[in-house]
Amino acid sequence: MSLNALDCARLTGQTPYTVEVFRPIRNIFNRVREYTRASTTSVGLAWMSKYIYQYHRLMLMNLSPREPATEGWPLFLYPPPHLLVGYQYLVRTCNDYVFDTRSYSRLKYTEIHLPLQQKLNWTVMANCSYTINTGAYHRFIDFENFEETLAQVQQAVLAERVVADLALIRPMRGYGTTNMAGDRQVPVEGLLQDHYKNLSQCQNHAWGLADRMRIQNAGNKDIVILTTIRKLKTAFFNFLVSPRNPHTILSLPCDCLWLDAFMQKFTDPSLSQFQTIQSLPSQSVTKSIISALSLPGPAPCTPLSGGAFELRPRENGRAVTEEMRRRRGEMIERFIDRLPMRRRRRRAPPPPPMSEELSEPEVEAFPPASPPRRSFEEEVRDTIVEAIRLLQEELTVSARNEQFFNFAINFYEVIQRLEMLGNINELTIRRWVMYFFVAEHVATTLNYLHHNLRLYPPCSRWVDLELAQVVMRARDHEGQVVYSRVWNEMGENAFSQLMARVSGDLAATVERAGLGELEEEEMEQFMADIAYHENSGDVSEILRQVAINDTEVDSMELSFRFKVTGPVVFSQNRQIQSINRRVVALASQLRMQHRPLPAQHEQVQLPP
């Protein structure tokens, strides 16, 4: 398959005009003589890349003819003799995310010799990391400094896939530092061409890393849906933790669109009315968190009671909760129809509930058993569940992609088992909350990398993912490593396979909270539960993680390492080939004389 000019431009960050001048060719079989020897071998290209052209930086610049980057040594107003297809796109992908640090190994080159084929590939290992402040979660559970962290924690819980310490006002693009091939603090943002849209436009529509990443490629309809889902979850959580006020009696007409009023009431940006959450038991608050996070799934905990008002039990002689249940479908359909979007398919309106004014049915000898009485809180949750489910059906396929976010199932199953065993205590709750949000970050980041490196068609066609690794380092308040974990996977599906392993591993560890060190007979079963793989870290580190008191963990450093390989293309432009031949000749001459090479952009006289 030949590399087309459009894919080349997209993956190198160059303009179509530059690619047209460059005239790329992938396979140089039977054309090797047109190029200098150093340009066609892996050893020669590695020498040129490091000492003459500095490809690790040059490939990030605008290489159009007569641009500032091409002035003087070694380009002399023309593009370089090679383009590393996908390298600039890789750096741009890493740069556009909230990593604190990004490091890239030295570029390596390999030769491919097959019948009628002679090619070169480039390979680089990227290591991107950032630190999350898990101490904020402990303070939340302990209710220390609550007034300072309430807004952040509430966003972290309800934004879905985000933590409080990564504020959205912080720009993602270019944040942190970048090191390349021994060069420190490389100003990547200044080198990269800004081809992509400004992601800050999404910040008024959704919280959180995952929401922002999903909206990155979403249309207006998906933005409306994702924002509405977030508001419904926010409203439900605020409803659960609101203080019950016996002086406020809610009169709820059975034919009103109560879901609109409910969402508006409990998504008030002012959190002052919810400050009394501090007086609630920590387990009650955490159960409310879990119930909101699990939407639209079933509630993993025992039924919860909400506050804010007392519900008038009957309206005009009718049971309000029962009437809400009967009119639920109609009310949800009308709620979704009122959103500013066009629905995927019009649904037939549900039949109206039967009027009680009809003639009374004949009395049966054995009347059917009445359904179990439902609480108002259960009906509210079931209504929100159904509304979110229908909204998710309206999402486009790309926005609905959840393969990296089904990790929550593992955590909900754990909390259900703990609930049945009566083992929900401070230690298990603390570890569940901390690992859930760590898994949120891992899922969000791996999904972002998978979307950009595997699902983006030009990249998936030409750039191969060889291996991926996630490293998790827990540190105490002094910055010392408490324990570290490593997960490795190989191949094209490494990102999704990593997520499955990390989520199952962390969820299984929750059940061991507070139980101390593993006994000899328990160790084998635990290793089977987490599906331990060889070359996935020291077993002693896993045992240390299981037995640790989680209050010692103040921060968690997450490192994402991945090795990618892409094609090297050669220029067919005779002028570029001639300049390269003369540059290599001068560089070889200076090297033999043990003299330094000219500085970048220096004006020198090339040999004929």
Curated annotation (Swiss-Prot):
Compartment list: Host nucleus matrix
Residues with site note (Cleavage): 175-176, 307-308
Major subcellular site: host cell
Pfam families recorded: Adeno_terminal (PF02459)
Residue numbers bearing the O-(5'-phospho-DNA)-serine modification: 536
Residue segments, region Disordered: 342-377
Keyword Ion transport part of the UniProt annotation: no
Residues spanned by motif Nuclear localization signal: 338-347
One GO molecular-function entry: single-stranded DNA binding
Highest taxon, organism lineage: Viruses
GO cellular component terms attached to this protein's record: host cell nuclear matrix
PTM comment: Preterminal protein is used to replicate viral genome, upon genomic encapsidation it is processed first into iTP and finally into TP by adenovirus protease.
Signal peptide range: none
Functional description taken from the UniProt entry: Protein covalently bound to the viral DNA that acts as a primer for viral genomic replication by DNA strand displacement. Assembles on the viral origin of replication in an initiation complex with viral polymerase, DBP, host NFIA and host POU2F1/OCT1. The terminal protein stimulates the template activity over 20 fold compared to protein-free templates. Neo-synthesized viral genomes are linked to two preterminal proteins, one for each 5' end.
HAMAP family listed in its UniProt record: ADV_TERM
Family: Belongs to the adenoviridae terminal protein family.
Subunit structure: Heterodimer with the polymerase; this heterodimer binds to bp 9 to 18 of the genome. Interacts with host POU2F1; POU2F1 binds to the auxiliary sequences in the inverted terminal repeats and tethers the pTP-POL heterodimer to the origin DNA thereby participating in the assembly of the pre-initiation complex (POL-TP-DBP-NFIA-POU2F1).
Name of the molecule in the record: Preterminal protein
Organism: Canine adenovirus serotype 1 (strain CLL)
